[in-house]
Amino acid sequence: MPEKALVTLRFGPYSSSSGLVDHRVSRLQGLRAVLVSDGHQVILEEILDRNTVELIVNGELVFRCNIKELDFGGDGQLDPLCEEARKAVKDAY
């Protein structure tokens, strides 16, 4: 994969501790930071699938996880899911 890929980060709504279901980017900060630090351009796209995060590279789904499993905030360096996503984008073709 080229060093500077265009990555579409698709994310669905999830319920917060208050019980409200909405699209929020706070759990995506680390994932986004990891991808941007690797030189990728990240585009956020809201989807309707609840609790879902998907990474699309060249029109291909390369990674999917539950948004609630991502660490809240931070730089993503200590989040194992962020490392898994980084590897999936790197290995995309």
Curated annotation (Swiss-Prot):
Give disulfide pairs as residue numbers: none
- Which Pfam families did the record assign? UPF0728 (PF15092)
InterPro entries, per the entry: UPF0728
Its domain of life reads Eukaryota
Give the UniProt family note. Answer: Belongs to the UPF0728 family.
Protein name per its UniProtKB record: UPF0728 protein C10orf53 homolog
The record lists the organism as Xenopus tropicalis
Its taxonomic placement starts with: Eukaryota, Metazoa, Chordata, Craniata, Vertebrata
